[in-house]
Amino acid sequence: MASSMLSSAAVVTSPAQATMVAPFTGLKSSAAFPVTRKTNKDITSIASNGGRVSCMKVWPPIGKKKFETLSYLPDLSDVELAKEVDYLLRNKWIPCVEFELEHGFVYREHGNTPGYYDGRYWTMWKLPLFGCTDSAQVLKEVEECKKEYPGAFIRIIGFDNTRQVQCISFIAYKPPSFTEA
């Protein structure tokens, strides 16, 4: 018992603890930092990207159908679709092919609550492609879906089964009868 008391007393009086870093004493005064205030109330002077501020046009809300991710771009070619699917697979997301026969875009039919839209849920083509490692497999399923339903909109989604969320969704095919108007 005496030896255990002796060793604990030796630890408490150790000179190594006396040389530890000083405790935190607080932040330095902000008086050392210069404060500049602009008196100009012009809205263009508020935002800055390091150069001259220029305004961008907004997406026209009338006559343009909104689809999924990348809907503002021209239709994707087969090579571009393969690259998107490769990206999906690199992120370890599960690819899934879905189709919609009537509306390939969000619309309002049953609800008028802000933020509520119909047309978000599409019909799944077969099962999700669990274990898929090649974009050619996914594009083959898209082609099969096109043959079965030539008048359908087809999209590819990427599902993260760890977080249980849909991470990406993009249109893979629009029917020939569809017009953008």
UniProtKB/Swiss-Prot annotation:
It holds the Pfam family RbcS. GO terms for biological process: photorespiration; reductive pentose-phosphate cycle. GO terms for cellular component: chloroplast. SUPFAM superfamilies: RuBisCO, small subunit. Keywords: Calvin cycle, Carbon dioxide fixation, Chloroplast, Photorespiration, Photosynthesis, Plastid, Transit peptide. It comes from the Eukaryota. GO terms for molecular function: protein domain specific binding; ribulose-bisphosphate carboxylase activity. Disulfide bonds: none annotated. InterPro entries: RuBisCO_ssu, RuBisCO_ssu_dom, RuBisCO_ssu_N, RuBisCO_ssu_sf. Residues 1-54 form a transit peptide. SMART domains: RuBisCO_small. It is found in: Plastid, Chloroplast. CDD domains: RuBisCO_small (cd03527). Belongs to the RuBisCO small chain family. PANTHER family: RIBULOSE BISPHOSPHATE CARBOXYLASE SMALL CHAIN 1, CHLOROPLASTIC, RIBULOSE BISPHOSPHATE CARBOXYLASE SMALL SUBUNIT 1A, CHLOROPLASTIC-RELATED. RuBisCO catalyzes two reactions: the carboxylation of D-ribulose 1,5-bisphosphate, the primary event in carbon dioxide fixation, as well as the oxidative fragmentation of the pentose substrate. Both reactions occur simultaneously and in competition at the same active site. Although the small subunit is not catalytic it is essential for maximal activity. Heterohexadecamer of 8 large and 8 small subunits. There are four genes coding for RBS in Arabidopsis thaliana. The basic functional RuBisCO is composed of a large chain homodimer in a 'head-to-tail' conformation. In form I RuBisCO this homodimer is arranged in a barrel-like tetramer with the small subunits forming a tetrameric 'cap' on each end of the 'barrel'. This is Ribulose bisphosphate carboxylase small subunit 3B, chloroplastic. It comes from Arabidopsis thaliana.
